[in-house]
């Protein structure tokens, strides 16, 4: 096989439609758009969900439920492995995590998760701590302090 003999598999590629090039092409004159009407015009067509002026389904059905999602507290996540960089005996606070750039917006809410290993005894202060993270920190001889609920939402 030579470089000039390379070709895609038959049927793998389609030739593009050249519209408006005579009736012999099958796509001449109206270019497959039919006659007149909104969909025949350039830029024509209706938005998704438009039902021709009839009240759309989404507005015919009643509203249901309630969502508090915009006000949900979104914690910055820190794993146990990220705490390994601190020296033994350090008190790890959200302010310290911000300063050392372990995570951004740590003061708005930090949750410590249990991925990785920890070999140093640290005192960890966070807004939330997973059970596996708590076990690993305490197994390394450290302490966990849960500080008050995060007041600001992390957006």
Swiss-Prot record:
InterPro entries: Ribosomal_uL15, Ribosomal_uL15/eL18, Ribosomal_uL15/eL18_sf, Ribosomal_uL15_bac-type, Ribosomal_uL15_CS. Keywords: Ribonucleoprotein, Ribosomal protein, RNA-binding, rRNA-binding. GO terms for cellular component: cytosolic large ribosomal subunit. GO terms for biological process: translation. Residues 21-31, 42-52 have a biased composition (Gly residues). Gene3D superfamilies: 3.100.10.10. Residues 1-63 are annotated as: Disordered. It holds the Pfam family Ribosomal_L27A. One of its GO terms (molecular function) is rRNA binding. HAMAP family: Ribosomal_uL15 (MF_01341). Binds to the 23S rRNA. PANTHER family: 50S RIBOSOMAL PROTEIN L15, LARGE RIBOSOMAL SUBUNIT PROTEIN UL15M. Belongs to the universal ribosomal protein uL15 family. Part of the 50S ribosomal subunit. This is Large ribosomal subunit protein uL15.
